[in-house]
Regions:
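Exposed loop/turn and edge beta-strand positions of beta-sandwich/beta-sheet ligand-binding modules
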Residues: 38, 71, 109
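Mid-chain, well-packed structural core segment of small domains
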Residues: 68-89
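Core segments of cupin and vicinal oxygen chelate
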Residues: 9-52
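Vicinal oxygen chelate
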Residues: 31, 43, 89-127
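A generic structural micro-feature
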Residues: 36, 46, 67-69, 105
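A short, acidic/glycine-rich surface segment
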Residues: 29-31, 54, 59-64
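N-terminal beta-strand motif that seeds the catalytic metal site of vicinal oxygen chelate
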Residues: 1-15, 29, 72-77
Length: 127
């Protein structure tokens, strides 16, 4: 068994698509748009076959995105090396994304950094 995909709602679906394509190498399918409900989605496929569905609907409401809450906490991307973690973190910082933890080795031995995407979702970048 494997997880087929993870889905998340976003406010700006095109900006979210561009973010994952530019920084994480995702490939996006064509935009799906249900004109009856105004639901929109992209499936983003990553190099290892993992998929993320980003979705939008006009009547969505904001959720308080504190660092700790019940439910999903973050999405983690393995980029292959410490150097790539460092380089991507610098690129994201220069592009204006908030770095919530600089590259470091955690107590359980992971080398990672954490950033917030354009909508405040936590993204972990690891080896």
């Amino acid at each position: 068994m494997r997880i087929e995909h993870v889905a998340m709602y976003v406010n700006d679906i095109d900006a979210a698509k561009d973010f994952f394509v530019q920084y994480f190498g995702a490939e996006a399918n064509n935009l799906y748009h249900n004109k009856k409900t105004d639901f929109k989605s992209y499936f983003l496929t990553f190099s290892d076959g993992a998929r993320l569905e980003i979705m939008n609907k006009p009547q969505m409401c904001e959720r308080n995105k504190e660092n700790i809450y019940m439910g999903y906490a973050h999405i983690a991307f393995s980029v292959g090396s410490k150097e790539k973690v460092d380089t991507l973190t610098v690129s994201l910082k220069q592009a204006g994304y908030k770095i919530i933890s600089q590259p470091r080795t955690t107590g359980d031995g992971y080398y990672e950094s954490c950033i917030l995407d354009m909508e405040g979702n936590q993204i972990e970048i690891t080896i």
